């Protein structure tokens, strides 16, 4: 049975881990990094993922970053005349993680646990699941990032404790409060903001640099795409540096030009200035912290430990704000970049039966219900209800002789239906005509362990039933998913062929180089005819390389290898011959030795 990998599919960075020998291990990517940038680029028909894609983002407009922010929406990105959904772009990242996990494990990987922000709604969860399928992964479970972090932290902790997980990622923010004890991880409350993260902290630095430059030079850098990308890189670097030092130098030469020549951006950013610029963002994270405590019916004194997740929690102002709000130092014993993937791998182990005695009780982050008369939102399942769960309620008709009922399914916390997120609509038809208020329509909501919603409506009079698994407006149909799976497989095959071709060209180049070296060494030691054969084979391979015909390169490479082998054989034969001659020469000398007679002379005679 194949291993279940744990994947943290992040806004900025992604990470993959696996359970080996009862311990979760983070799998490094081919560059040796333990996290991979969630960046995809298209260049000359080739797909680049991760660090290589991020490196060329400045010069390549076909580079896609932070696609996770668009999951569950109908947003599409157009690249080289083709439209891609967020699910497809995410699938390219997942495919890359899957491929290097397979290289590490030495076996195919088909099953995964993927994490999502706790505050992701149904559409966003469904989109994540679809992305996994497109990448060729059976998504065994979707789990919340803070819950995964708690799993990674609490696996070896014996005592009962209440922990608050503060997860500030690249594009999303979550807070979850969990109770740990006897292998049970129970989520008591969760709150968050799907549009707040490290990217926003970068943005305040970018805005500051743009306004400074405009003040000094009268040029708006935000209108220049390439300058903006350079600013983004510099802002991210400065933000990271200010976690360790109190000031940093930002230097961007030739960022723009005017009639007098090139212009450079040179400035010093202090930690104090950065804290002033980002104070409103830090304060925004405190709202969900207070909300989660209130929902769980707890005070800050009830929290035993605060776990930090996400690279942005390294910002000193963030840590200071948490300390002020909760009255305790955040726990620093986990790596905020890796802990979520490790937790996902542990959950994979639980599903596969490798990890025993762990029960994970998660909650739904938002209330679910339907629209009723007057546009009111009637909740059936309150937020922070433990999942999986099921809830039914009986409704009736609003008009006399009404034969169909529209079921409008919503997710959110606002009292009016129009202010909440529509998950889907369906109709229950063929209701026998009757005065209003007489028919009995039972609506049932089911939420599975992945947090995905199923709704059904039943006419209790006729037992007629209608049900849907919620497909958001951005949801993909089965045909679309199958088409995307096929395309992803074809692309993976094309990528494999491209790599094979590159390897073949490298081997051919290497062989040409070694042949030239060998020929130089053997000149005068083997016959000119043999050397000529090798030279001709080498020139033929060079010509094939220039034409870029792979089959021809393969043939010519084999021919040159054969010629070089022949040269080596000839060299060894000659060396053996010479050694033989030397030996027989030594034997002849021995035969020509003259035995001399001698006589002893006695001087005493």
UniProtKB/Swiss-Prot annotation:
Sites bearing Phosphothreonine, chain numbering: 172
GO MF terms held by the record: ATP binding; ATP-dependent protein folding chaperone; unfolded protein binding
Residue ranges with Acidic residues bias: 594-605
Keywords, alphabetical: ATP-binding, Chaperone, Nucleotide-binding, Phosphoprotein, Stress response
Residues covered by region (Disordered): 579-605
SUPFAM superfamilies: Actin-like ATPase domain, Heat shock protein 70kD (HSP70), C-terminal subdomain, Heat shock protein 70kD (HSP70), peptide-binding domain
Expression triggers: By stress conditions e.g. heat shock.
Protein function: Acts as a chaperone.
Protein family membership: Belongs to the heat shock protein 70 family.
Entries under HAMAP family matching the protein: DnaK
NCBIfam families recorded: PRK00290.1, prok_dnaK
PANTHER family in alphabetical order: HEAT SHOCK PROTEIN 70KDA
Name under which the protein is recorded: Chaperone protein DnaK
Gene source species: Geobacillus thermodenitrificans (strain NG80-2)
């Amino acid at each position: 049975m194949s291993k279940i990998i744990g994947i943290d599919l992040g806004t900025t960075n992604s990470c993959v881990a696996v359970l080996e020998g009862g311990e979760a291990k983070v799998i490094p990517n081919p560059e040796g990094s333990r996290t991979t940038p969630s960046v995809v680029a298209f260049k000359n028909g080739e797909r680049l993922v991760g660090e290589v894609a991020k490196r060329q983002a400045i010069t390549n407009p076909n580079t896609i970053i932070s696609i996770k922010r668009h999951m569950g929406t109908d947003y599409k990105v157009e690249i080289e005349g083709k439209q891609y959904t967020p699910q497809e772009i995410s699938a390219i990242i997942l495919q890359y993680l899957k491929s290097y996990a397979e290289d590490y494990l030495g076996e195919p990987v088909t099953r995964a646990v993927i994490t999502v922000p706790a505050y992701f709604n149904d559409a966003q969860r469904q989109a994540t699941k679809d992305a996994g399928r497109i990448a060729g992964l059976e998504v065994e479970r979707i789990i919340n990032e803070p819950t995964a972090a708690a799993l990674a932290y609490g696996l070896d902790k014996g005592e009962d404790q209440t922990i608050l997980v503060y997860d500030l990622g690249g594009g999303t923010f979550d807070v979850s409060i969990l109770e740990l004890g006897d292998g049970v991880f129970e989520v008591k409350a969760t709150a968050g903001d799907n549009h707040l993260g490290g990217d926003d902290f970068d943005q305040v630095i970018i805005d500051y640099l743009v306004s400074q430059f405009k003040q000094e030079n009268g040029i708006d850098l935000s209108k220049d795409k390439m300058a903006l990308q350079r600013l983004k890189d510099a802002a991210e670097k400065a933000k990271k540096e200010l976690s360790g030092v109190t000031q940093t130098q930002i230097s961007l030469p030739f960022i723009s030009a005017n009639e007098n020549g090139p212009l450079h951006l040179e400035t010093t950013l202090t930690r104090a200035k950065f804290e002033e610029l980002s104070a409103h963002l830090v304060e925004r994270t405190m709202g969900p912290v207070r909300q989660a405590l209130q929902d769980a019916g707890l005070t800050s004194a009830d929290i035993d430990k605060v776990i930090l997740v996400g690279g942005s929690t390294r910002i000193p102002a963030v840590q200071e704000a948490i300390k002020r709000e909760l009255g305790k130092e955040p726990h620093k014993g986990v790596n905020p970049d890796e802990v979520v993937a490790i937790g996902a791998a542990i959950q994979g182990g639980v599903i596969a039966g490798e990890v025993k005695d762990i029960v994970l009780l998660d909650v739904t982050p938002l209330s679910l219900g339907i629209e009723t008369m007057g546009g009111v939102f009637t909740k059936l399942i309150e937020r922070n209800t433990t999942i999986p769960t099921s809830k039914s309620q009986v409704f009736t008709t609003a008009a006399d002789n009404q034969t169909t009922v529209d079921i409008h399914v919503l997710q959110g916390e606002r009292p009016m239906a129009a202010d909440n997120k529509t998950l889907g609509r369906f109709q229950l038809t063929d209701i026998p005509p009757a005065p209003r208020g007489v028919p009995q329509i039972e609506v049932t909501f089911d939420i599975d362990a992945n947090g995905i919603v199923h709704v059904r409506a039943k006419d209790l009079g006729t037992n007629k039933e209608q049900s849907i698994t919620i497909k958001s407006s951005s949801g993909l149909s089965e045909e679309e998913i199958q088409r995307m799976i096929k395309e992803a497989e074809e692309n993976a095959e094309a990528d494999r062929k491209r790599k094979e071709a590159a390897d073949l060209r490298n081997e051919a180049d290497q062989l040409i180089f070694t042949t030239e070296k060998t020929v130089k060494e053997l000149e005068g030691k083997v016959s000119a005819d043999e050397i000529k054969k090798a030279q001709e084979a080498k020139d033929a391979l060079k010509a094939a390389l220039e034409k870029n015909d792979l089959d021809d390169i393969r043939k010519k490479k084999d021919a040159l290898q054969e010629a070089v082998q022949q040269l080596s054989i000839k060299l060894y034969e000659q060396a053996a011959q010479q050694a033989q001659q030397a030996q027989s020469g030594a034997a002849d000398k021995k035969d020509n030795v003259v035995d001399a007679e001698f006589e002893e002379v006695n001087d005493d005679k």
